[in-house]
Design a protein with these regions (language model features):
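N-terminal, positively charged/glycine-rich alpha-helical extensions of SAM-dependent methyltransferases
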Residues: 1-34
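C-terminal helical/coil "lid" or tail adjacent to the Rossmann-like core of SAM-dependent
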Residues: 14-16, 197-258
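Conserved alpha-helix/loop element of class I SAM-dependent methyltransferases that forms part
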Residues: 26-50, 61, 65
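Class I SAM-dependent methyltransferase SAM/SAH-binding core
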Residues: 51-101, 111
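Conserved catalytic/acceptor-binding region of the Class I
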Residues: 105, 138, 142-223, 233
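A short SAM/SAH-binding and catalytic strip from SAM-dependent methyltransferases
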Residues: 110-125
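A short glycine-rich, Lys/Arg-flanked "PGG" loop and its adjoining helix->strand segment in the class I
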Residues: 127-139
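Core SAM-dependent methyltransferase catalytic element
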Residues: 192-195, 263-272
């Protein structure tokens, strides 16, 4: 339920979060939590790529780190808005709408990466989006998808209420409200003709009980729901005061109930 990059444009306003400078900080916190939980920036067995594409690059942090790992490669970050300042020399940012098709020819990219766009890409578009990712991938190259569930577990009262508000908002906007994207990542890849597909589920802790990862994830979700308060108010008639109280109660629940949030990582290889 945690929105990543590829934020809303004038044409596509389905992304649930409004634009705001603090979103840069939140997305970076999210990145650090995921990197630590996975133990790496990716799980696919990528070796010395010459061209890497990060779709929905957000702040660019993931791509910046790939630039450092593969200094001989060009890393391209695609998003509706520009990356943060300080990009490495081998980074190139492209502003484009994923839903209008990727602005690349067939078979160009060694490694295609896309993360946390289920709160930006309509459910009905997912199969076509993954097919387009496979199209631009070079034969023998790798595609990796990372997406989150639409629920927090256990769904304690305040936590469950916040998650339900998020799902209602997503449903209104044609986004995933049932976890179908989370559960279908490997199938999307297989149906796009990708082979050697693997899927890994990871349960991330929320709260200080979960150490550094839990602390980062709690900060991410606290910022997420705080940012969503005016959106909930406008779309669902929920007062800012109720949202504030729900967030406060939810933070207590995370520590008491050892709440977790699951992500799925699926990757595969484009056949030669």
């Amino acid at each position: 339920m945690d929105g990543g990059g590829d934020r809303a444009s004038d044409r596509d306003v389905s992304y649930v979060l409004p634009r705001h400078p603090t979103e840069v900080d939140r997305l970076d916190v999210q990145h650090y939590a995921l990197r630590e939980a996975l133990g790496a920036n990716y799980l696919a067995p990528v070796q010395r790529p010459t061209l890497v594409l990060d779709v929905g690059a957000g702040t660019g942090q993931w791509a910046f780190e790939l630039c450092a790992e593969f200094p001989e490669a060009q890393v391209v970050g695609l998003d509706l808005e520009p990356s943060k300042p300080g990009a490495p020399a081998n980074y190139r940012g492209i502003r484009a709408n994923l839903l209008e098709g990727l602005p690349f020819g067939d078979g160009q990219i060694n490694f295609v990466h896309q993360r946390l766009l289920f709160s930006g890409v309509p459910v009905k578009a997912w199969a076509a989006v993954v097919t387009d990712l496979a199209r631009v991938c070079r034969p023998g190259g790798w595609i990796e998808l990372v997406e989150g569930d639409t629920e927090l577990r256990p769904a304690s009262p305040a936590t469950g209420r916040l998650a339900e508000l998020f799902r209602r908002l997503s449903r209104i906007r044609g986004l995933d409200s049932t976890g179908i994207v989370f559960s279908s990542l490997d199938r999307y890849l297989t149906r796009a003709g990708v082979t050697a597909v693997e899927r890994h589920n990871v349960a991330l802790p929320l709260g200080e009980w979960g150490g550094r990862i839990g602390s980062l994830m709690a900060s991410d979700f606290r910022a997420l729901f705080t940012r969503l308060a005016p959106v909930f108010a406008a779309a669902l008639g929920v007062s800012a005061e109720e949202c504030e109280e729900l967030v406060r109660e939810a933070r207590e629940e995370w520590e008491r109930d050892h709440t977790t949030y699951s992500i799925a990582v699926a990757f595969g290889q484009k056949p030669n």
